Amino acid sequence: LYISIHVNAAFDKKASGFEVWYLSPGYRRTVIDENTVEDKSLATILNSMLEEEYTTESILIAKYISEGLEALCGNEMNNRGIKQEEWFVVRNANMPSVLVELGFVTNQKEATLMTNDEYLQKMSNGIYNGLVQFITHFEKSRGFTGL
């Protein structure tokens, strides 16, 4: 599991909110190098299976983190939702991965919030609670084989 935590910036100083990104399902990364297996067609099949699993898990992680942040920070900051993109930080992770943008440093109100220790603790608790929800879901479904 790979979680990259950032703060956002925009030319529009009114841009606001937190958001969670996952890798676009259409992007296919190579998890298993074809040169490490005898049967190259097997590597293709395994890569496809792993990518499908990683995408499913990444979407769920993004959902649960977004919900965790919403529960603790939604009164003070806009939830921009979960989104997909081929960001470098998630594209090159050979595991389930998400990018969490905690707010906009170019927005005066949010920049001030993100310098407040109590608010930062709320945000970290929101992320933590989302991860607990994901792990609980994962363990109940035994690795999503039941999906």
Where in the sequence are the language-model features?
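Active-site-proximal helix/loop segments of hydrolytic enzymes
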Residues: L1-L147
